[in-house]
UniProtKB/Swiss-Prot annotation:
This is Ribosomal RNA small subunit methyltransferase G. One of its GO terms (cellular component) is cytosol. The lineage of its organism: Bacteria, Pseudomonadati, Pseudomonadota, Alphaproteobacteria, Rhodospirillales. One of its GO terms (molecular function) is rRNA (guanine-N7-)-methyltransferase activity. Its EC number is 2.1.1.170. Disulfide bonds: none annotated. It catalyses: guanosine(527) in 16S rRNA + S-adenosyl-L-methionine = N(7)-methylguanosine(527) in 16S rRNA + S-adenosyl-L-homocysteine. S-adenosyl-L-methionine binds at residues 71, 76, 120-121, 134. Specifically methylates the N7 position of guanine in position 527 of 16S rRNA. It holds the Pfam family GidB.
Length: 205
């Protein structure tokens, strides 16, 4: 899959596509120096990383004013969503080299973001309307990291693989959530977990 197919599948504008091309070019260049993504995924960058991130954009709640992406790494999905126009995006990443990459992509693509070079646990509550994450941790741990950053009525969009249902079951021991399951556009067995009404404490039978 290439950029033109992304255009067909997602409906992004030509302007956004060109900015994503710049992003992809920078990733390939930086990948030679630091391990931003799995080396075997680079040839399939537009599907494995770009489209995987782009698919979250229509799920962002109407009226959202701030998005926080946890464990941003190479910027998937948070920086891609910022390029597409998501509001007031904060990228949390502990690796300073990856933060340098995120800032360079933001500069070159003229995308306003806030890059936070800290461990998630060290970041003060950010009051996010939407929290995103991909391939970061099991759901119960991920909710523990995300919850302090959720504003009232905030939602989570988590990209998950084939174990998503098991993770939902395990998280129910500690968390109350309303979960929608959206089939992944890039992983036949994967899901986007759209979580609302998140609160700590086992639900009453």
């Amino acid at each position: 899959m290439g950029p033109e197919e992304l255009l067909t599948k997602s409906g992004v504008s030509r302007e956004t596509l060109e900015r994503l091309r710049l992003y992809a070019d920078l990733l390939v260049k930086w990948q030679a120096r630091i391990n931003l993504v799995g080396p075997d995924t680079v040839p399939d960058l537009w599907s494995r990383h770009m489209l995987d991130s782009v698919q979250l954009f229509p799920l962002i709640k109407v009226g959202a004013r701030r998005l926080v992406d946890l464990g941003s790494g190479a910027g998937f999905p948070g920086l891609v969503l910022a390029v597409m126009g998501a509001p007031d995006v904060h990228l949390v990443e502990s690796d300073s080299r990856k933060c340098a990459f995120l800032r360079e992509v933001a500069r070159v693509t003229e995308t306003p973001v806030t890059v936070i070079n800290k461990r998630i646990e060290q970041v003060a509550p950010l009051g996010a309307d939407v929290v995103t994450a991909r391939a970061l941790a099991p759901l119960d741990r991920l909710l523990g990291w995300a919850f302090p950053h959720l504003a009232e009525g905030g939602e989570c969009l988590f990209l998950k693989g084939r174990g998503a249902e098991d993770e939902l079951t395990a998280s129910a021991k500690e968390w109350n959530i309303t979960a929608s399951r959206v089939p992944s556009l890039t992983d036949p067995g994967g899901l986007v977990l759209h979580l609302r009404e998140v609160s700590r404490g086992r639900a009453q039978p």
